[in-house]
Amino acid sequence: MSKEFIRVVGARQHNLKNLSLEIPRDRLVVITGPSGSGKSSLAFDTLFAEGQRKYVESLSAYARQFLDQMQKPEVDHIEGLSPAIAIEQRTSGANPRSTIATTTEIYDYLRLLYAHLGQPHDPETGTPMACQSATEIVDRIALLPTKTRLMVLAPVVEDQRGEFRDVLERLQREGFVRVRVDGQIQELNPKEPIRLDAKATHTVEVVVDRIVIAEGVRVRLADSVETALRWGEGRLKVLHQAPDRPTDPWTETLHSTRMYSPATGRSFDTPTPQHFSFNSPKGACPVCHGLGQKMVFDPSLIVPDETKTLEDGAVQPYRRMGGKKMVSYYKGLIKGVAQHCGAPLDRPWKELSEEARRTLMHGSGTDEVDFWFMSGGAPKKTRKPFEGVLPNLERLYADSESEFTRNRLKAYMTLHPCDACRGRRLRPEMLAVTLGSEALAGSKVPGRSIADFCSLSIAEAHVFLGGFVLSDLQRRIAGEVILEIRKRLGFMVEVGLGYLTLDRESGSLSGGEAQRIRLATQIGAGLVGVLYILDEPSIGLHQRDNDRLLETVRRLRDAGNSVIVVEHDEDTIRAADHVLDIGPGAGIHGGELVAQGTPAEIMASARSVTGRYLSGDLCIPVPRHRVDPREDKGWIEIIGATENNLRNVDARIPLGTLTCVTGVSGSGKSTLIDDILRRTVFRQWYGSKERPGAHREIRNLELLEKCIVIDQAAIGRTPRSNPATYTGMFNEIRDLFASVATARVRGYDAGRFSFNVKGGRCEKCEGDGVLKIEMHFLPPVYVTCEACAGKRYNRETLEITYKGLNIADILQLTVDEAVNFFRAVPKLHAPSLTLAEVGLGYLRLGQSATTLSGGEAQRLKLAAELSRRQTGRVLYLLDEPTTGLHFQDIAKLLEVLFKLRDGGNTLVVIEHNLDVIKTADWVIDLGPEGGSGGGQIIAQGTPETVAATPGSHTGRYLTRVLRQKPSPTSRSNRG
């Protein structure tokens, strides 16, 4: 076995054509080639899958049953393979409890740090807290007035499930006669033992003593306190009742030998790491349970259309709740309140007075309102205060036991920061434990809480800990912890993530950001001898930050690892030790090793399209003319954008043009376009529940008809989804087969030719074409269905043919073949031709959507848009459409974008790729830096204007590519 190479023999996974090659070990190897050529099939579906499979096979059969096992890839054999770790572009899921701090395990170290070095404060007054001794506790209790009745309790069980029979029996044996169980005092009687529900949570506190404050009671009190502290493990509770007030409720006070506030007399548990976890009941905010947000009724969803009147049903929920009687009842409510406020029923909501709208939404308080309701066929007057629409809906939601009703009410709710913890997830006493001495604005407590620390950007947190001065004792306690946190923060700064905040939810990260976080985590792990496989780590990264990313990847290699990167970025390819160029085309036209060697050897290869782009022989040209923004066409104007780090930004987007929004990572691009523009449009036009980002207004949206977001998400999540179903061609194909004479004679309709429903499909495989066989300790095996031979349909359905082909044959046609085959059927020829024009001619009509790359899925969506009748008033939003695209694919993508633009539509593209930016008609460059250093518009104008702007990082790199001479034959030269 070679120690210098990974030797792959006979790789046939997906479209790989019996590929055999040697990949040098302990090197930085870049796999490149057109989208769909087989790069991921080689890197992830062959190399990683086999490395993972061999590792899992080394485990016991018992362990294997708990793991997701990968199928053996279609390859003869692989030699010299190390344990493999894949760092892909997948996001981290939508779990709201997962943040950057928890994902990177920084939060675990922070919990240790705050538990050992944090200074506790009283959450009410901000005064530092100190520990109480047993004597001090006795002194505090003895200050109660003479004749005060009190009980000393020791908590022995807190919020735990179980019967606790042994605990109660032990207390009885020790001589105790009373306990408080779930707030109720009960006697310990052996004849009538206390029985608890084993499935419910309980709190059990033993009554150590019952005392009346008087002279000479101190010795007994001290003895009781010591006993209670021993049983309560350092904690006790005192219930006392004022003298001569036997009917007053008992006042409860917690005392602890750990933390005590002299200002308020309150005691708290000594903080432990668990107290700083928002996933633990000990630390989580009791209102939002550690989520930091909760569902609340949103006035903008309750009154979605402010041009409607009360008479016409401006208050949306009251139009749809219950039957006719309830609708009539709510009409009576609204009418009564409107008359009380002097609000005309026929006036639009937005024209009502502020006072009238406030009363309708929040209630009349103590003021009584006259209501008239029908009772027994006659109107009946009722006088009472009006609780308000919002309190009424909140009460209905809280009281309803009907899941249907609650789901219906959820349509009017959105997520808002929790009022109790202000979105910080933890209990007040844990938020009052701080590090440092600098007082933050609006806080009673000096220093930073763990939530304040997590609200810092990664770069700011790195600086904060760097300036943290430790005493010798503190250094011995937490020096290693701080070093580990700083190391992880430093790695993330190095891969260009310094602008992200530690409390950012993992689900909100882009694929590139999530991947770079995992990359930083792997560097911190310090593993050696591993095969790392990375999927386009440069995605979402500005050119300025590329060098730091490459240095990080080199560090992985220099530690003694083999690093394979699937990448299209020119700088990354040039930095590689070895390049594998897969191609020459995509799909059935790819799967071959076109060239391999150093970047210089790739550039010298006549067969390599990648090499020709690297050498400058081919390039995406600068357009000779651009579409000039015209005032008569109009502009979308975003005024006063202040969401996240945006600093009162005013942005103008010319209609009918291709606009690129650029800037370093974290400068505010996605906030401006996605959080503000898209969310505002989707809420106004489509009733979306997503809250738009903060801004004053967006002008001229009425000049557009609709908004479409085109991303690289899969077009379907099941193998049944394919290009024919997505583009709508399959409906036309089924109608075509149903119109064949034989089908009409047999009475077959279009449904007969669907593989999703009973009738025409093969029932043995239920239209899948394959059968899944579970192998228990091995991964499941998929075998071709014997009944239909993988064709999905039953024999009778396959007997129906059109021009000699049955429905299964049609689904096996490539797009290029379909263009010719359906030349006489306009409804099928046109979409086939569009798919071919966007470079997808190699796809099969019935190819499973799950096998498509991100670039292929995106071009499929663009083709579907091109196939529709163009109205010229559509706003298209694209976020980094060049993800996963080769130079050649970017040229094809631009052709499609130009077609959409030439149809009069408006395209807004968030992009880092300079080839796309240089061909744009208009550029909005944000910056100058990321995070708190960004949020400003550095330049707006043509690419040439941005390139000439001092202080623009984008402009600096744009200058170089704008010098490339335009090609006279390039279609991108059209204005």
Regions found by a protein language model. Give the residues of each.
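Conserved phosphate-binding elements of NTP-dependent enzyme cores
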Residues: 1-975
